[in-house]
Amino acid sequence: MIELQPVDELVVDVAIDNLTDSYSSKPAHVSPEFNNVIQAGAQALSDATLCCAQLSLSLVMTASTGQHRHKLLFDAGPEGALFLRNCHNLGVDLTDVGAIAISHGHWNHMGALLDALDGITQGRREVPCHVNPGMFLERGAQLTNGQIAPFEPVPSPDALAARGAQVVNREDARLLLDGHFYLSGEIARVSSFEKGRPDHLCRASANDPWALDPLIMDERYVAVNVRNKGLIVFSACSHAGVVNVMTHACEMFSDVPLYGVFGGLHLSGAAMEQLIPDTIEHLKPFGLQQIMPAHCTGWRALYALLSTFGESVVTPSAVGSRFTFH
């Protein structure tokens, strides 16, 4: 039995996401970007004080139990200066981040990691950085015209260590920060229709040939048990398929009610959009009270989720938003 400690409150600051949206009305547990930057000290709403959207998802998650607080950075986004700018504008203090967890080895989730480490450690301490060996393969994609587009390499374990990371490079699941966060191990692929990303490639080095890598087996998710609500699953891209992710989480925590899922569902792009109807149908049995789509979910999937589950359940993410669960 995994002893994931229940938390009294979980605050999730969206440091990076694909979209910016402060105008749409939000439910009570979501504070929009405009409110957050003014609260952080901005004297006016301007280009300099607002957040910028990018192709990624980065979450700063603060779990509180009594007088104890634990802060986790889940992914960092593609570009360091923008990550640091957004955190500054939101008033997100990085110096008390207790650990970093990375979802998978793509440039747009790890590219900002070295600068994030600088912001966290200030050159004065080390911070655990949880990864797994599969994240450090070279990655690429086959374009519709047949060309191969290599992805920018992610920082190596040595590069991370040189910037203050205590690199924890293992494949297994683990509890983080006194048991307040769960980082999964490998996610079993069990659904009949979630077959991964067909255009995805990998290779061990630049001297090796590209090989098909649709399943992206290095992907991991984070889960938090919020007292009086239940388990919230954070899946940055859901390359494993969000139904597989939720099935795995239910099996790992069969004694904890499932409350919600937050993250990219990777249902955008011609091949992945075909999975939207099956995904919707297979999400229904989980009885989710909150679905918080982000990043790579795509507008067609978002429309389908809203049409099926309604606005009381579906709350889209946006950069600069703050979600509070208690």
Name these PLM-found stretches.
Residues 13, 130, 166-171, 182, ...:
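General small-molecule cofactor/ligand-binding pocket signal
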Residues 48-55, 63-99, 114-115, 122, ...:
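Pre-active-site segment of Zn-dependent metallo-hydrolases
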Residues 74, 177-186, 232-235:
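Short hydrophobic-aromatic micro-motifs
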Residues 87, 313-326:
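Binuclear metal-dependent phosphoesterase catalytic core
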Residues 99, 106-110, 128, 208-319:
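Cap/insert and terminal regions of metallo-dependent hydrolase folds
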